[in-house]
UniProtKB/Swiss-Prot annotation:
Descriptive protein name: Argininosuccinate synthase
EC number, as in UniProt: 6.3.4.5
Gene: argG
Matching CDD domains: ASS (cd01999)
Pfam family for this entry, one: Arginosuc_synth
Binding site for ATP: A8, Y9, S10, G11, G12, L13, D14, T15, S16, A34, G115
Assembly and interaction partners: Homotetramer.
Positions with a binding annotation for L-citrulline: Y85, N121, R125, S178, S187, E268, Y280
Enzyme class at the top of the EC tree: ligase
Subcellular location: Cytoplasm
Pathway(s) served: Amino-acid biosynthesis; L-arginine biosynthesis; L-arginine from L-ornithine and carbamoyl phosphate: step 2/3
Length: 409
């Protein structure tokens, strides 16, 4: 009996060649296609996998789970890698790999396989998830396999092999970029973008309009949260209302994209040590992250917020590096969920030509006291108390300066 392998399959050149290669090595290949919001023809991908040699094909719609259990979870900690990247690709990978493991267990497969390269982050994200969820599964990673690397030294070898084996391929020179698309974002890498000094042409961007070409009228959205989770979006101009998590997120993508929101061009540090340039479009999540952070401003205790903010970079790093299923992630999420218990309320944001600006916020758990904050009303705050407060905090500064002067004599 042939040994079974579940292959994470996209329908592209690499994974199609890998599928056929695995078949020729004697494996019973089960292809698994994850729908996380990319604009693909999934029926065509399924047909291609079967024609290429897969014994069975799973096409899994993971979009809702992606929003509720992954994007919204990352939002709890305001996850941003290196202070800028909203982690659209990194957040999707553990979900894709988790479902792959579940299918392998259901099918009694001994192996899982993926088509991630040996230079990138995705190989780590996939394989750490496999290890965390089922250590008994064996991993086939062709782009780290000496036999595969000897046979396929580049894209030309892949194309020649595909043609020889009758694998349908689409080789286009129209978009010379490596792109990853899901519900949260689309990323653009490689090609001319590998030169960090190169200014991208407008045709790089496929989701968002240029901010300068966005509408001349602002869009006002009211975004409602419960315990830090988005539960409703209302367009205050046309009355559109969304409460279903998937529809809510798709609507934010739509509004953000047409208003030029969410573009990012950065050089980031990959986990394996290589620097990489990425151009990202993340419209909906950008709106959510800004609105969520604003609501925290009136609902979170100062010290809790500051402590969470200290942990947020580590949270983002764990996601980026592939440690979604890890003890340290469980620890952080428990703390973040506790910190979000009163992050309930609504924020109004003005969206205009690439900008997202909070203009109003309300929460039944607001810690903002208008009388205490007022410049005109004393509100029970004794201003003379500030004198002692300042003296206490100034004490160590005075001592430091006196000692410093003493050393200088």
């Amino acid at each position: 009996m042939k040994e079974k392998v579940v292959l994470a399959y996209s329908g592209g050149l690499d994974t199609s060649v890998i599928l056929k290669w695995l078949c020729e090595k004697g494996f019973d290949v089960i292809a698994y296609v994850a729908n996380v919001g990319q604009k693909d023809d999934f029926d065509a991908i399924k047909e291609k996998a079967l024609k290429t040699g897969a014994s069975k094909v799973y096409v899994e719609d993971l979009r809702r789970e992606f929003v509720t259990d992954y994007i919204f979870t990352a939002l709890l900690g305001n996850a941003m890698y290196e202070g800028r990247y909203l982690l659209g690709t990194a957040i999707a990978r553990p979900l894709i790999a988790k479902r792959q493991v579940e299918i392998a267990e259901k099918e009694g497969a001994q192996y899982v396989a993926h088509g991630a390269t040996g230079k990138g982050n995705d190989q780590v994200r996939f394989e750490l998830t496999y290890a965390a969820l089922n250590p008994n599964l064996k991993v086939i990673s062709p782009w780290k396999d000496p036999e595969f690397l000897a046979k396929f030294k580049g894209r030309t070898d892949l194309i020649n092999y595909a043609m020889e084996k009758g694998i349908p391929i689409k080789v286009s020179k129209k978009r010379p970029y490596s792109e990853d698309e899901n519900l949260m974002h689309i990323s653009h890498e490689a090609g001319k973008l590998e030169d960090p000094a190169y200014i991208p042409d407008e045709d790089v961007f496929t989701w968002t309009v240029s901010p300068k070409d966005a509408p001349d009228e602002e869009t006002l959205l009211e975004i409602h949260f419960e315990n830090g989770i988005p539960v409703k979006v209302v367009n205050l101009k046309d009355g559109t209302e969304k409460t279903d998590p998937l529809e809510l997120f798709e609507y934010l993508n739509e509004v953000g994209a047409k208003n030029g929101v969410g573009r990012l061009d950065m050089v980031e540090n990959r986990f394996i040590g290589i620097k990489s340039r990425g151009v990202y479009e993340t419209p909906g999540a950008t709106i959510l992250w800004i609105a969520h952070r604003d609501l925290e401003g009136i609902t979170m205790d100062k010290e809790v917020m500051h402590l969470r903010d200290m942990l947020a970079p580590k949270f983002a790093e764990l996601i980026y590096n592939g440690f979604w299923f890890s003890p340290e992630m469980e620890f952080l999420l428990a703390a973040f969920r506790k910190a979000q218990e009163n992050v309930t309320g609504k924020v109004t944001v003005s969206i205009y030509k690439g900008n997202v600006m909070p203009v109003a916020r309300y929460s039944p758990y607001s810690l903002y006291n208008p009388e205490l904050s007022s410049m005109d009303v004393e509100g029970g705050f004794n201003a003379t108390d500030s004198k002692g407060f300042i003296n206490i905090h100034a004490l160590r500064l005075k001592v430091h300066q006196l000692v410093k002067k003493g050393y200088q004599k």
